[in-house]
């Protein structure tokens, strides 16, 4: 296999079509459509910078859930809050991103959650790896014991 073939095998192409009013209809490499643009009256979709926060949350969330399932943790609810702080001058990049994982379940081991978050942040989440090259990312978690009958 040549070097160019190896690179081409990993190439992903997203296509965006201008839809007017500073909005774009984007098609992901997997064929899903998303509307994005600049926040102003009449646009009811996430901005490109908001999509970065969503991408980070989705990426790390999938990792954490998968790891906790492998560790046989009984998670009944899981929420991620991603908070981004942007600098004032252009380009208005995120300078700090906080990721808060809220895990609820039965006898969930906080050490298992801490390890799952750490593995996602340092090994598995590609979005985190991309963003952490120029942005401070701080992760934390909370475990809430589920009460009542097991589902």
Tell me the role of every PLM-derived stretch.
Residues 59:
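Alpha-helical metal-binding/catalytic segments enriched in His/Glu/Asp
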């Amino acid at each position: 296999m040549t070097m160019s073939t190896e690179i081409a095998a990993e190439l992903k192409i997203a296509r965006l079509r201008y839809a007017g009013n500073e909005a774009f209809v984007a098609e992901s490499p997997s064929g899903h459509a998303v509307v994005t643009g600049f926040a102003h009256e009449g646009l009811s979709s996430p901005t490109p910078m908001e999509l970065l926060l969503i991408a980070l949350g989705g990426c790390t969330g999938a990792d954490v859930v998968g790891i906790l399932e492998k560790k046989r943790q009984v998670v009944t609810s899981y929420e991620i809050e991603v908070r981004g702080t942007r600098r004032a001058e252009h380009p208005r990049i995120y300078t700090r991103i906080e990721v808060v994982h809220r895990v609820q379940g039965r006898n969930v081991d906080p050490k298992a959650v801490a390890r799952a978050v750490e593995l996602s942040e340092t090994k598995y989440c590609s979005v985190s790896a991309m963003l952490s090259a120029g942005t401070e990312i701080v992760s934390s978690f909370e475990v809430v014991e589920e009460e009542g009958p097991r589902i």
